């Protein structure tokens, strides 16, 4: 008991521990409890669905109706599986475009002496500061065709703009890629700056070519940052509604 008492006193006396404890309590009250409550309601019958559930169901009875309706009903394909498939496809292609683009830009800014590097390093971040839906509006202003009414800039010049370029997955993927490449740029550039340059110099002294140094020394060291950028990019692109709308 005395050890437990001393442990509690040590935790309470440490301001950092108290901040963590208070944060966990707030997290539990504002997020965990409402989330569990919301999940629990999906297993209880509601007044509006009693007729559909049938079998003499009463309000509050246990039911799997909502999960069956979402996962295995006639509406599941239209309201769940197709949107989920499209979101995953878009997320994967956004990663394929934006992560290599941001990583290459990071390497150019950190490992090369291109002119105007300081200004370019600031300009590279600006697209992420602008909301993604504004890029979608800019895309429409340039590529919109007569299908939606008013012509965009290129259609106004008399150029035929196909629907697949003006709207749809390709337009969404490109707009999101122009927005989310900043994730990989920021993460990879920070990782490159933290790498001890002596490791690359030693590889060069041993006769390794630049591609070999990049492949066997630099890339393994920045791989965690690239994987973090992949996770951030695909999660954000899947959850972004403004561009698609």
Each language-model region and where it sits:
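Short, membrane-interfacial amphipathic segments enriched in basic
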Residues: 1-8, 55-64, 70-73
């Amino acid at each position: 008991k005395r050890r437990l008492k001393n442990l509690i006193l040590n935790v309470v006396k440490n301001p950092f521990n108290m901040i963590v404890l208070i944060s966990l309590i707030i997290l539990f009250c504002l997020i965990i409890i409402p989330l569990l409550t919301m999940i629990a309601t999906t297993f209880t019958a509601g007044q509006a669905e009693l007729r559909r559930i049938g079998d003499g169901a009463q309000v509050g009875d246990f039911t799997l109706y909502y999960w069956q309706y979402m996962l295995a009903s006639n509406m599941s394909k239209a309201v769940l599986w197709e949107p989920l498939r499209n979101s995953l496809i878009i997320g994967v292609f956004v990663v394929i475009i934006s992560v290599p683009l941001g990583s290459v830009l990071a390497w150019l800014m950190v490992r090369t002496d291109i002119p105007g590097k300081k200004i370019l390093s600031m300009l590279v971040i600006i697209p992420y500061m602008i909301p993604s839906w504004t890029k979608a509006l800019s895309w429409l202003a340039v590529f919109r065709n007569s299908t939606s009414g008013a012509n965009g800039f290129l259609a106004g010049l008399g150029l035929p703009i196909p629907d697949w370029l003006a709207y749809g997955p390709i337009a969404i993927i490109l707009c999101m890629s122009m927005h989310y490449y900043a994730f990989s740029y920021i993460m990879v550039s920070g990782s490159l700056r933290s790498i001890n340059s002596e490791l690359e110099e030693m590889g060069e002294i041993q006769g390794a070519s630049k591609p070999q140094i990049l492949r066997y020394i630099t890339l393994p060291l920045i791989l965690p940052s690239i994987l973090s950028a992949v996770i951030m990019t695909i999660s954000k692109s899947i959850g972004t509604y403004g561009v698609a709308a």
